[in-house]
């Protein structure tokens, strides 16, 4: 599965080579995807190369070859200037603006239960794009939420198992952009990928810490990470 940014870059390179026969420059790619620096382009190209979508040709400047396109090739994913992805975004279709989670809706006369929208999936592992589904709500105890706006995400991965969060669980998130050290947060990395991790500070940098010794703590500059909310509850279904 490619992230939206990876798909946008792949299609931009593909279309440019169809038009001119020459791959775009790193500056052109950076501008087309509205990234702040070329380092983000280097990371995207490396990811595409590792997944077998492109190949770098040796001993030639700006030499890239598109080997294949995604099975669900969608020209609408060509990058548009000014596109700003959110932590919740569509998978392969045209991106849709995502409204802030609506105020919780009581679902019982006694007010003991609240309906919360399930907004998609979140990685507890290597970051992936969260995928907006928003096809259903879940009902949670009102005392789980407290004040503020909330949404739910389905967990994919095992990097938070020592915190009691398992693959397939549903986490309840209080919407917000700040966190304290030790909070488990939804973190958006490089405006592209979302992950569920414990928030730490390492000097001026931000550390996203797993709760599984098989995963390394990842360190980022403060401008590369945006907090999208904090964990306040968890729901597990037993089948």
UniProtKB/Swiss-Prot annotation:
Residues 26-46 bind DNA. It catalyses: Hydrolysis of Ala-|-Gly bond in repressor LexA. It comes from the Bacteria. The keyword Ubl conjugation does not apply. It is an enzyme of class 3 (hydrolase). The record marks 124-125 as: Cleavage. The active site is at 159 (for autocatalytic cleavage activity), 197 (for autocatalytic cleavage activity). Pfam families: LexA_DNA_bind, Peptidase_S24. The keyword Transmembrane does not apply. Keywords: Autocatalytic cleavage, DNA damage, DNA repair, DNA replication, DNA-binding, Hydrolase, Repressor, SOS response, Transcription, Transcription regulation. GO terms for biological process: DNA repair; DNA replication; negative regulation of DNA-templated transcription; proteolysis; SOS response. Its EC number is 3.4.21.88. One of its GO terms (molecular function) is serine-type endopeptidase activity. Homodimer. Belongs to the peptidase S24 family. HAMAP family: LexA. Represses a number of genes involved in the response to DNA damage (SOS response), including recA and lexA. In the presence of single-stranded DNA, RecA interacts with LexA causing an autocatalytic cleavage which disrupts the DNA-binding part of LexA, leading to derepression of the SOS regulon and eventually DNA repair. This is LexA repressor. It comes from Rhizobium etli (strain ATCC 51251 / DSM 11541 / JCM 21823 / NBRC 15573 / CFN 42).
């Amino acid at each position: 599965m490619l992230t939206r940014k990876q798909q946008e870059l792949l299609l931009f390179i593909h279309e440019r080579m169809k038009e001119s026969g020459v791959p775009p420059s790193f500056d052109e790619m950076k501008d087309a995807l509205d990234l702040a620096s070329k380092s983000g382009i280097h990371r995207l190209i490396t990811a595409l190369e590792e997944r077998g979508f492109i190949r770098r040709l040796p001993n030639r400047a700006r030499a890239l070859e598109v080997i294949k396109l995604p099975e669900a090739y969608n020209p609408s994913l060509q990058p548009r200037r000014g596109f700003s992805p959110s932590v919740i975004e569509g998978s392969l279709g045209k991106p849709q603006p995502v409204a802030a989670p609506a105020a919780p809706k009581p679902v019982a006369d006694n007010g003991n239960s609240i309906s919360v929208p399930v907004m998609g999936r979140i990685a507890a592992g290597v970051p992936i794009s969260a995928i907006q589904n928003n096809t259903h709500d879940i009902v949670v105890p009102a005392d789980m939420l407290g004040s503020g706006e909330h949404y739910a995400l389905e967990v994919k991965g095992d990097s938070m198992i020592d915190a009691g969060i398992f693959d397939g669980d549903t986490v309840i998130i209080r919407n917000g952009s700040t966190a304290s050290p030790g909070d488990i947060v939804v973190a958006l990395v490089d405006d592209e990928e979302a992950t569920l991790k414990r928030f730490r500070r390492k000097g001026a940098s931000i550390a996203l810490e797993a709760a599984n010794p098989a995963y390394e703590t990842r360190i980022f500059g403060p401008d590369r990470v945006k907090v999208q909310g904090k964990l306040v509850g968890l729901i597990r279904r037993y089948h």
